[in-house]
């Protein structure tokens, strides 16, 4: 199957936004206009094509990034009439699903950032924006819901500038706002566009309304000044009264967007079909193709040398698995982005992250949750493979003869856990397997068992995250389960470096056990996890026993010395030891490693850590005092407050343990008029009195 369009005519984009900015509706309209949908779905009635899981339809929020593909021919400018393929990844807007946003941004080349014209920049917009900055994703902004009462395009542009530190540059301004929203002034062509009142998908071009002429001129100069950073000649021509062609403006707008110096900003109302076609034109015109993004970097799995792959079909195949999903009809789907080369259905690839070979069964392109079989995929494509057994999110897939490992994805640790138990014997048989499948799909979801109680524990990024997963157990896997109260995922760490000897000796005639290790244990920067350094010289411990020492340490890390919580952020250096020709074994060194680590931690000022959450509450002014007082009573630290869209916002850092059931309290305190968002910030040392209480509670539990 030959390429349908050249690589320079491919756009891999995401649509990123706050939870209610109208993301799914906008994607629906895109698919409708690009000819992939016959009937437009509405999120209000649970009929939207992109929201394809039962829970998404019910809650009206998007949970799984569905990947879809469509084609578009711009109607103006340099790309006019040229067919382009747009691959879209719909990303969720709720903070509990930040991992979905993170992994989609990793494989995108550009993004459309959606803002609500009434709400402006909301808390999740900031989170998603920071994630996009991390990957240097060029963006176009689309101010949606211009037809709503209270819509204010210019106020939203101002909030993008102030709250996100971005440089939004309007390439359109609205004709009317709220119920009077009738169309836009196109600042590139200096023409008015008036949408049909009944069906916004049709419009007519008119002269710029008389009362908007001076405003349109002001914003056109603003646009030319903004792009002059990339090309000064354009502004000079304008100021000297010379004619500037449309194509000149478009070319420089594209350069400035790709350089990340500006965010071209448009407006519309997706629900009323107004503005989506112009947004599609801008996606093609301003966002990068894989050719613009250039080579992808990686390293050789054996030699560690740096390697680059060119985005070409002729280059060796390299791709990144960014999502695992279970499809009710075809089973496990591995979504991946092809960075270079061509991959054929039925061929073999190397998973260079694990070193295992995998056979590609079928190759599918997804249109939301509908499938289309492909015989091959090319550089720049986003597709799904069926039949891959051991590929996980973030693994590199590549040509066996030319191995490469692309940069890995890093996911946050879960912060909340609950006990889960099956309702019946039949459920009991299916629970383990079903949870394993869910954990395979979602790197921030963990399953473990409490050795003391035998309970199964599930951990995730928030209450909603776990609620949705328990719901999926019921719907997709037909497993009924009871869940306990949410528990905080506490951690332990150390504050100083110490040396310690770990010794395991059992010698009383016959085959004994002998292992002795000298360890240096020191604290690591937060979030670094565990680092093991083998500093053994002169073979004082044979090489084959060294991995066993590390395994013993990692076993011991699961159960901290203060209250039995996992230990994190430690570096362990094995620098000396002894072995016995006959009695030493892997088991002896594993136990010695474990004993040595536990002893070291006891001396290294161990402390208990708890997850600290970033909380933002938006409330009517009359409840501000109550909200702040309540946050302070929850050990919260108020970090800032201000005015937003006629309401007050409060930013605070609050321990997760104090936030359970907060939504109910907030609702009753503000008569349902306030709302809040919460996301994990970092682990933080627990105050002494609370640490002692936790210690006692744990001792009592162990005594039982």
Curated annotation (Swiss-Prot):
Q: What is this protein called?
A: Elongation factor G
Q: Show the GO MF annotations.
A: GTP binding; GTPase activity; translation elongation factor activity
Entries under HAMAP family matching the protein: EF_G_EF_2_B (MF_00054_B)
Alphabetically sorted, this entry's keywords are:
Cytoplasm, Elongation factor, GTP-binding, Nucleotide-binding, Protein biosynthesis
Q: Which family does the UniProt entry place this protein in?
A: Belongs to the TRAFAC class translation factor GTPase superfamily. Classic translation factor GTPase family. EF-G/EF-2 subfamily.
Q: What is its main location?
A: cytoplasm
User: What InterPro entries does this protein's entry cite?
Assistant: EFG_II, EFG_III, EFG_III/V, EFG_IV, EFG_V, EFG_V-like, EFTu-like_2, G_TR_CS
Q: Which residues bind GTP?
A: 17-24, 90-94, 144-147
Superkingdom of source: Bacteria
- Annotated SMART domains: EFG_C, EFG_IV
Task: Write out the annotated subcellular location.
Answer: Cytoplasm
The UniProt record lists the tr-type G domain at 8-291
* A Pfam family it matches: EFG_III
What this chain does, per the entry, is described as:
Catalyzes the GTP-dependent ribosomal translocation step during translation elongation. During this step, the ribosome changes from the pre-translocational (PRE) to the post-translocational (POST) state as the newly formed A-site-bound peptidyl-tRNA and P-site-bound deacylated tRNA move to the P and E sites, respectively. Catalyzes the coordinated movement of the two tRNA molecules, the mRNA and conformational changes in the ribosome.
Q: Which GO terms describe its cellular component?
A: cytoplasm
Q: Which GO terms describe its biological process?
A: ribosome disassembly
